Amino acid sequence: MSTVKITTTLGDIVVSLYDETPLHRDNFLKLAAEGYYDGLLFHRVIKDFMVQGGDPDSKGAPAGKRLGMGGPGYAVKAEINARLFHKRGALCAARLGDEVNPGRESSGSQFYIVWGSVYKPAQLKQMEKQMQQNQVTIAFNDLVAAHKDEIMDMRR
């Protein structure tokens, strides 16, 4: 896992980049090394949820300019991983919604950092276990529903 320090006028933010998403990790590291993010704004801030940055159009943008559509001219192939969910402190790739982006590709440069709720690592681990158990339960219930008649015959 790689870490990156984002220096802002309000202090530093250290984020982790997962090895399980190598295309996104390598792209972010490349852009950071090139200085792509230097001087860019966090152009979207939603209180108690997230901040978004990475739009090159935000560099030197006048107040009131609509931001959020700029990028390096390419997208990053989706690397969806159910284990990596949007928990507090997570660095996430921004993307357009599924209805206009069925491939679920990410912006080439825009990202957001989730603030949301504060959880202890043990709480996050328990939530992950519960989600996995829920998936097993759903699969089991689907099988039971599909074979209900056979199961009832076996019980007789």
PLM region spans:
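Cyclophilin-like peptidyl-prolyl cis-trans isomerases
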Residues: 1-156
